């Protein structure tokens, strides 16, 4: 299995996509070729406009998949690249997994002329064709690297913010800020000092990501490879997601 494509809860509105970030670039490229049935522009252009309106840079994100849906065993257990796609935002919800989740309800309230169902089929179909017919699988790890780099930046910021918050909390106790500002007519429990947040050395992660960036950039030259080399590369690309899993299972949730 090369990849798993999941969709559910489709309706009118804007394209939504998430999944393995190795597939992010390919999915975004596909949305350039499909027209939004209500606006007459590409699905990508309309989604970019929404991102700008919401304060973004016009390049909407590709969310990471959680669990609780059909794609869960593929991406988290089998280590198969997976994506979840659909349209929404301009139709009411609340009927999902209820007795009202019917064809009649969908036809009346969700997508009356089935236009977005057709648009979704065009996107999913193009994704399947790209995966099936490309000489080299359309897996691109630049977005994956950028995403993981972002996670590391967030963790760095989190530890710094936590450390500063604890230092301020303890300083307030030393200066009796909490007791001096408490209402004497109300119950008051004096806060206790918190343990200092230690500094964490993330240098090994930074170095690993720097080395990975070199490899990711080198994959950009894959079109110059021989057919035999492409076959070898395809096998590695197809199993790349597996490397990100643990054979024993998730933390405190073994297989």
Question: What positions do the PLM features span?
Answer:
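Secretory-pathway/membrane protein signature
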Residues: 1-255
């Amino acid at each position: 299995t090369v990849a798993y494509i999941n969709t559910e809860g489709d309706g009118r509105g804007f394209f939504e996509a998430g999944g393995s970030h190795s597939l992010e670039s390919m999915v975004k490229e596909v949305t350039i070729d499909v027209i939004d049935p209500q606006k007459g522009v590409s699905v990508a252009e309309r989604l970019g406009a929404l991102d700008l309106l919401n304060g973004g840079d016009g390049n909407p994100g590709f969310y990471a998949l959680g669990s609780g849906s059909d794609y869960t065993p593929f991406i988290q257990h089998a280590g198969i690249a997976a994506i979840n796609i659909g349209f929404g935002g301009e139709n009411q919800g609340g009927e999902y997994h209820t007795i009202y989740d019917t064809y009649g309800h969908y036809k009346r309230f969700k997508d009356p002329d089935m236009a977005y169902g057709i648009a979704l089929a065009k996107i999913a179909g193009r994704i399947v064709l790209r995966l099936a017919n490309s000489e080299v699988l359309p897996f691109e790890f630049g977005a994956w690297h950028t995403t993981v780099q972002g996670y590391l930046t967030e963790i760095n910021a989190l530890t710094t913010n936590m450390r500063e918050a604890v230092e301020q909390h303890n300083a307030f106790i030393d200066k009796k800020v909490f007791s001096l500002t408490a209402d004497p007519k109300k119950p008051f429990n004096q806060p206790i000092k918190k343990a200092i947040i230690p500094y964490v050395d993330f240098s090994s992660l930074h170095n690993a990501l720097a080395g990975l960036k070199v490899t990711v950039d080198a994959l950009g030259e894959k079109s110059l490879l021989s057919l035999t080399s492409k076959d070898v590369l395809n096998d590695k690309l197809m199993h790349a997601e597996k490397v990100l899993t643990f054979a024993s299972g998730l933390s405190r949730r073994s297989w």
